A protein has these predicted regions:
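A polyanion-binding, active-site-adjacent surface
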Residues: 1-131, 135, 139-177
Length: 177
């Protein structure tokens, strides 16, 4: 992952894109999902620029850390349970290093469900928590988990998510933070 180690907001995707983060070495960098995400982050003043092309592009994100559950591209974009399990320790380490973390924004249902399963290893969560875009849930350690549709080209092109929806969610997070 990358960003501000003093982050209050953690943005979690599922995996690096084969021709984006996997190629560039930075999550949501050099792909269409990243173009959408960083435009939104820039417009709500979390990022200093509206693009993320490569790790030398000068991008800075304020009080935010961005990562993926998987650290490599899953074959055929379908992660196996073993891959998810093997990578979960890396995400747990990232979370434990973010001492000021207050809000976790998951991008996509699979990222949401897998983030939750990692949390359930550490905490007894009795409440039923379901993926619903824009829904927020208080976690046992006081952090807030928020679900969002993934900003994939398919979701953007079919208008499942748009710039206004994502910006509204980021503004909501700003009020929680």
């Amino acid at each position: 992952g990358f960003g501000d180690i003093k982050a209050k907001l953690l943005i979690v995707g599922l995996a690096p894109a084969a021709h984006g983060g996997n190629r560039t070495g930075r999550a949501f960098t050099g792909d269409k999902s990243g173009e959408f995400l960083f435009r939104c982050l820039y417009e709500v003043k979390i990022a200093n620029q509206s693009f993320s092309n490569n790790i030398e592009d000068g991008l800075k994100i304020h009080s935010t850390y961005i990562t993926n559950i998987l650290k490599c591209v899953p074959p055929k974009d379908k992660p196996s349970r073993k891959e998810l399990y093997n990578c979960s320790q890396h995400l747990e380490n990232e979370i434990s290093n973010l001492k000021n973390l207050r809000v976790i924004l998951t991008l996509g249902k699979i990222a949401f469900e897998n983030f939750l399963s990692i949390y359930k290893k550490k905490y007894d969560i009795k409440k039923k928590i379901f993926f619903k875009h824009g829904e927020s849930y208080k976690l046992p350690d006081g952090k807030t988990l928020i679900a969002s549709y993934h900003p994939s080209p398919r979701n953007v092109n079919t208008k499942i998510i748009n710039i206004k929806m994502m910006k509204n969610l980021l503004y909501k997070i700003g009020h929680i933070n």
